[in-house]
Amino acid sequence: MLKGGMLSRWKMWSPQYKILRNHLINFKSVSTYKNISGVNTKQPKSPRQFGCMPHVTKKRKYKYEEGKTYHGFQCERVEHISEFELTSYTFRYERTGTELWHIDRNDSNNVFSINFRTTPFDSTGLPHILEHLSLCGSQKYPVRDPFFKMLNRSVATFMNAMTGPDYTIYPFSTMNEIDFRNLQHIYLDAVFRPNLAYFDFLQEGWRLENKDIFDKQSKLVIKGVVYNEMKGAFSENAQVFSQNLLNNIFPDHTYRHVSGGNPLEIPKLAYNDLVEFHKKYYHPSNARIYSYGLFDASKTLALLDEEYLSDQSWVDNSYSLIRQQERWTQPRLVHISSRLDNMGTTIDRQNQIAIALLMCDATNIQESFELHVLSEVLIRGPNSPFYKNLIEPNFSGGYNQTTGYSSDTKDTTFVVGLQDLRVEDFKKCIEIFDKTIINSMNDGFDSQHVESVLHNLELSLKHQNPNFGNTLLFNSTALWNHDGDVVSNLRVSDMISGLRESISQNKKYFQEKIEKYFANNNHRLTLTMSPDEAYEDKFKQAELELVEQKVKLLDEVKIEKIYERGLILDSYQKAESNTDLLPCLTMNDVRDPPKWPKLFIQNVQNVRTQICKVPTNEITYFKCMFNITGLSHEETQLMPLFCNVISAMGTTNYNYREFDKHILLKTGGFDFKLHLIEDVRDSKSYSLSVMINTHALNNNVPEMFALCQELIKNVRFDDSERLKMLIENYISYISVGVASSGHLYAMLGATSQVCDAGKLKSLLYGVDHIDFMKNFVHSTSTVDICDKLSTIASKVFNKDNMRGAINTTQSYEPSAISNYEKFLESLPTFGKTQTSRNIHYLDPSCQQYVMNIPVNYCAKALFTVPYLHQDHPTLRVLAKLLSAKYLLPVIREKNGAYGAGAKISSDGIFSFYSYRDPNSTKTLNAFDETYKWLRANQNVIDQQSLFESKLGVLQQLDTPIAPGNIGIDYFLYEVSQEDFESYRSRMLSVTIDDLQCAIENYFGKESMHYGKCILGPVNANLELETSHKWIINN
């Protein structure tokens, strides 16, 4: 039997760029953060975008009855959603009014979350810093940073904490009930009884401290984890633009503040203000509690009653209510500045514009849903009016990240934003926006275009999401926070039916909506942004002046106290915590993951085909891969662009508008991805393949294969104007937001110094790809690019270099195979070409990508052994141990970076990284001193830390898999169920002696093949401070 699903989740990151026409990105705020090892998390999607299409059934036996009380919780509402076999129970604790929403569902991935409505009244980042501090120790668990320590004492599939613009949530999920109860205790104690220690405030929030804490003569600077995090956030232009849009469209409101914290305002926060805020806003009366899955909810109710709520009483929480924004009588225009992005386009085009409209109250569920659909009709794909009028004229780099409909705030918003346009085109954009609204109001929409949007929504609801409980939580949080009806919000099929009926009865239904919400809406903000070459200098000067103002208020005694406090904090950070106070799973608590359905390998018309018969909710998933290793170097470098544009160019029989309409009416789209796959057995070779991924309802499978055949046989690259627009949008898209994923780009940059396969990865996915595309487009005419892509298309889709995979239901499998055979009959065959290349390893090297940002992203990569080597599981355990015991304490807690860690990829690249880091060479030195630290702290590697590190690996290995992705590891890497089980068994058998041997073998002497990389500001002393020669990429 073959196993599918884990390896692809943790292999070296390979970003696959998609043009924004394929999906809408909701209006985000800078104020949504992830509190795990540093990676920024996007705001949850609209509550209308999750997988449920329910039907309510009245008569059935329920576990809890309406009107009855269980452990102090009265059951107020019970509803069954039959299509997803879940039952919703709404409870309210009688003493405090705390609402608990339990979703009972036969799903092994159980979820729990405590939510609070936390409305900021300034931009000091108080709710965000409190989120960090709450997880730094509590009454029952007085351990420094139990949250991070629990990461490796649990097999949680998800652990997090997030601050939104008006809420803070603390969610986790796990498939193990003992783990679930352990984490419930940790989270509940953290939020209701946190220690809120002053020195944790200094570490996580902000502090004034000597730059060198051991030198009292060194200058005073501002430090702090959140402070550095927000410096990083405010250096990202997309974040700055989104945050200002939120602040300015709600100017009289809590949303005018930055809940995450403006770095120049954070140092105004006083510790006592944070303590008082917790008392008020983290009161149980202001809490909402969510649980999901198959674990017994009565145990949760009993725990809350007995340990946290019974000694509390109700308080009026109206102080946290979010009122509606008062509507404007006149539209407004706001202009802001941003940093010059040296990764971006030319300075004259580094401008952005957004036109935003305030829509309806988010709690008006049907109205909000219909506006969401209308928004998709207006902006989605080449058949939408805004795409036709704003994107296709090609005076910008396409939609920006704010575009779309958002229901994440009390009043919903609709935004159309463009990036990379000239200042003189701002006026043109506004005029086109107005004209498009008027024309849409007068002319209406093509009925097939509307139907394609609704079909795509209905198809998305059929997906079986392995993280359904988390998805439901995130998509309900904002609505629930505004006291909206989250249960009725699950009735998406009813909302779709209601909309269809309204449209059938009134052909101008959408046109009337446009008149009301778009044409006659004075609450309209036009936000523009342009680069300022002095932006970073101005920030540095403002930061310097802020420090100077604070220093002026200090006498010598206070300065001495700051120095002494820094030493005390250093000792506090180095002190050992009694982690025995924290719960931890034992090996007896760890269960084997479920075995996945058998994979059948068949030869279908000489094409190796993998078939998995599994319940898929009436969807058939199809993947096929074409080996393209034989392409030339230039053709290979063009493959990411090829994958991005191929389904947007049209075919011999359909122009691009017609083809897009057919795709959306019959399938979930065609996703082309480029895969560089190393041999996981010996790392001596690699191959390149392009994978096509699509899915459709079973009754649309014939059309799915027909459209796929049409695309790969008849794609046209003869429309040079169309391609020019797509290329410019693509370059804008990949150039924006490099810093937000800076640690990933840094790891790719470091890996590119290790071997030629790593160098190719950087050319295909990294900063080097951005540079290549800019230079290539500058030196090559669009007509020539058309010819090159057309040549690639004639080479890529070779049946002799193909393999396929089908996941479908057992009953539909014969029909799926029959349609697949017809698809294969027409594919061209022109003999096998080169299928692999040998890997060559390089001499050690270091490089920096210079970015004008105030933080760094550092990485070091070295070659070890690949996935199926016997030492790989040991090194993976070691990576977890180093992250928890060395890198996070030193680089995050002590030195102030937002995140740090170590990981090993399937090809054997062992990487160290930091995220939003105030340091560069100091961090690289910490990476280099790993062996020295391990030898000096051998006592750290004990049985408990070893076991905890294994649990951290199990979290990744045992992650649930969607039915459509079962078998993916075998399809990509030929890692079988037996291989996986052997790997898992070897990992669990790793001993302390194994770790010590691995330390000596792979870190005891400097690796022959390693690379270092920094993304960050200029450092004139880089070579002097590191004693290495550096390649500087400006």
Swiss-Prot record:
Q: Which UniProt keywords apply?
A: Hydrolase, Metal-binding, Metalloprotease, Mitochondrion, Protease, Transit peptide, Zinc
Transit peptide located at: 1-29
Q: Where in the cell is it found?
A: Mitochondrion
EC id: 3.4.24.-
What Gene3D superfamilies would the database entry show? Metalloenzyme, LuxS/M16 peptidase-like
Q: Quick one: where is this thing mainly located?
A: mitochondrion
Q: Which InterPro entries match?
A: Metalloenz_LuxS/M16, Peptidase_M16_C, Peptidase_M16C_assoc, PreP_C
Provide one Gene Ontology biological process annotation.
Answer: protein processing
Cofactor(s) listed: Zn(2+)
Q: Where are the transmembrane segments?
A: none
Q: Where does Zn(2+) bind?
A: H128, H132, E229
User: According to its UniProt record, which residues of this chain constitute the active site?
Assistant: E131
Q: What does this protein do?
A: ATP-independent protease that degrades mitochondrial transit peptides after their cleavage. Also degrades other unstructured peptides.
Q: What family does this belong to?
A: Belongs to the peptidase M16 family. PreP subfamily.
Query: Self-association or partners: how does it assemble?
Result: Homodimer.
| Record-given protein name | Presequence protease, mitochondrial
Q: What organism is this sequence from?
A: Drosophila melanogaster
